[in-house]
Regions:
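Helix-to-loop junctions at the C-terminal end of transmembrane segments
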Residues: 68-79, 259-273, 357
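Small/aliphatic-rich secondary-structure junction motif
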Residues: 411-462, 486-489, 543
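Cytoplasmic helix-loop-helix junction between adjacent transmembrane helices
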Residues: 110-150
Length: 562
């Protein structure tokens, strides 16, 4: 939440505990793509029909969906590390057993156990990385997103290479890699404190009573119906071996990762969540129609699948953003409820597609998938006003659009302060104190604006700190400044995902109160992350009719230019 100029601290200088979990994240995110290249080989070797093989997705995703309802209850009682380890143990056991199986029914059953482990793992991995990372919240999120992108992109490639040796290869590969991650997690990840309050088992289902969350959840269900129809059945009409299928889905995965991390936030910031989703879902419907029409033309299917990666990457990010926008409940509960509905759609789609393909022909499931994408537009339209209201801040619950909350005494009108914007970073005190000296020299009071960040990654949303912690941080700054004889006031600026939007809100606030100047520190996020979801400082520079300066401990403040 600070300036982009200069060199940011590297998010990759982390303790061994973080690398252990990040490695496991890469392998976990490989999960779906790893299996795709071996689907035709699996069907041939075990004399199974495509509809029978599709149950690998159904058992995995349906169990993951149901387990998402309970992961909050489990982790709030046994702690994040134990939940993480339990998930890893289950993945190792059931991935290994799937590799030893000689029947499609056995693999389907073992994939269900794998899905349970995956739910326990993905629900806690981000929290463990954030809790264990050095260099602050931003570095932890960058590392997690890197693991996400790497896993999605590399999974199909590894699956294709191992699958070209034997269809058992990807299963044994996951088991071995996750066992390494399990040992490293046990050895290096410290015990983390349990949450202060326990999550109710019924909380995610109760959350679905809220119209906004249920509406966005149904939209996600329909989207995942189309997505997993394509993922489960597109390999067959391509008529490629495991190695070449791996290359195709690697190209797809690279686009998913790139558009999810780098392009989706920028499109959202420019056009709004709902508008981008409308266009994106429509494009996915067209892609599915192309696959259905060209189901007997392998080249057409290959190109359509690779291109779909761009739209899927955007949708994966913005669908979660839409859920968080309209959700009036705590974000972990909203994530669990959303994950449940989302994965149910993904799990049922391959099963239904298989039955349709057996009864008709292979093009029909793809037509149905296209219809699901179009129906998702209709459902989104029914909740459009809720999304718009949330983006404007006119909803109850946790704030999603950037918003300022006063901490401490309200200043008198016309106080024209120097504003310092700073997040929950290691040298926050030094940045505030440097800005305080600048304010004192200018004969103006200081206003401390503390940035409270929430990151949204896939179906997960995690806060750098809760509201009380952010408030306590501001009060700590104010108390310290009081002892130094510097007049100061405080605010908390809540930011969810979109850093540039937070910068625009701060700029408008500075204009409204006729602030003398705005001081920022050096960004801990780096250039790539700032390109992805917008630079806070750049947004301030472009929107504030004020002087913007960078302050660094031990250095003279210097003015920034747009």
């Amino acid at each position: 939440m600070t300036a982009s100029h200069g060199t940011a601290p590297s998010p990759f200088k982390q303790p061994r505990a973080v690398w252990a979990v990040a490695f496991a994240c890469v392998v976990s995110f490989m999960g779906i793509g790893l299996v795709d290249p071996i689907l035709p080989a699996l069907a041939g070797s075990l004399h199974a029909t495509p509809s029978q093989v599709s149950l690998l997705f159904t058992s995995y995703l349906v169990v993951t969906a149901v387990a998402m309802l309970a992961v909050g209850w489990v982790s709030s009682r046994i702690g994040a590390k134990r939940t993480l380890i339990a998930g890893l143990v289950l993945i190792v056991i059931f991935a290994g057993l799937a590799g030893t199986s000689n029947s499609i029914g056995g693999i389907v059953g073992f994939r269900a156990g794998w899905g349970l482990g995956n739910a326990l793992f993905i629900a806690t991995s981000l929290a463990v990385i954030v809790a264990s990372a050095s260099g602050g919240f931003a570095g932890a999120i960058i590392l997690y997103e890197t693991a996400l992108g790497l896993g999605i992109a590399v999974g199909p490639l590894l699956g294709g290479e191992l699958g070209s040796i034997s269809w058992r290869g990807p299963f044994f590969g996951v088991a071995v890699l996750m066992f390494i991650a399990l040992v490293a997690t046990i050895a290096f990840v410290p015990n983390l404190p349990k949450p202060e309050h326990k999550t109710s088992l019924a909380a995610p289902l109760k959350a679905l009573r809220h119209r906004g969350l249920l509406t966005m959840g149904i939209m996600a269900l329909l989207y995942n119906w189309g997505f997993f129809t394509m993922l489960g059945y597109a390999p067959y009409p391509m008529e490629l071996n495991a190695h070449k299928l791996g290359l195709v889905f690697t190209g797809w995965g690279l686009l998913v990762a790139a558009f999810s991390v780098f392009f989706a936030p920028r499109l959202q910031a420019r056009f709004g969540t709902a508008k981008v989703l409308y266009v994106n879902l429509f494009c996915l419907g067209i892609v599915m129609a192309v696959i259905a029409i060209g189901v007997n033309t392998p080249a057409a299917v290959i190109v359509a699948v690779i291109v779909s990666g761009a739209f899927i990457g955007i949708n994966n990010t913005l669908t979660t953003q839409a859920v968080m926008l309209v959700s009036p409940v705590e974000r972990p509960v909203a994530s669990s409820a959303y994950g449940f509905v989302r994965f149910i759609g993904g799990g049922l789609a391959p099963f239904v597609a298989g039955k349709l393909a057996d009864a008709t022909n292979l093009s029909v499931p793809f037509y149905l998938g296209g219809v699901a994408f179009i129906l998702a537009i209709v459902v989104l339209a029914s909740g459009h006003k809720l999304v718009d209201a949330a983006e404007k801040g006119a909803v109850e619950g946790e704030p999603v659009c950037p918003s300022l909350q006063r901490v401490g005494a309200t200043p008198a009108p016309g106080y024209q302060p120097v504003i310092v914007a700073v997040g929950a970073i290691e040298n926050a005190d030094e940045i505030v104190d440097a800005a305080a000296l600048m304010a004192r020299d200018a004969g103006r009071p200081l206003e401390v604006v503390h940035i409270r960040e929430t990151a949204v990654v896939e179906e997960l949303a995690i806060d750098a700190e809760d509201a009380e912690q952010a408030r306590a941080t501001v009060l700590s700054h104010l108390d310290r400044l009081f002892t130094l004889g510097i007049a100061a006031t405080g605010q908390v600026l809540t930011s969810v995902g979109d850093h540039a939007a937070a910068g625009r809100v701060l700029a408008q606030h500075a204009n409204d109160i006729d602030a003398r100047a705005i001081a920022v520190g050096r960004s801990p996020r780096g250039q790539a992350a700032q390109f992805a979801d917008g630079s806070f400082t750049t947004a301030v520079l472009h929107n504030a009719a004020r002087t913007v300066v960078m302050v660094e401990p031990g250095k003279a403040p210097h003015r920034l230019s747009a």
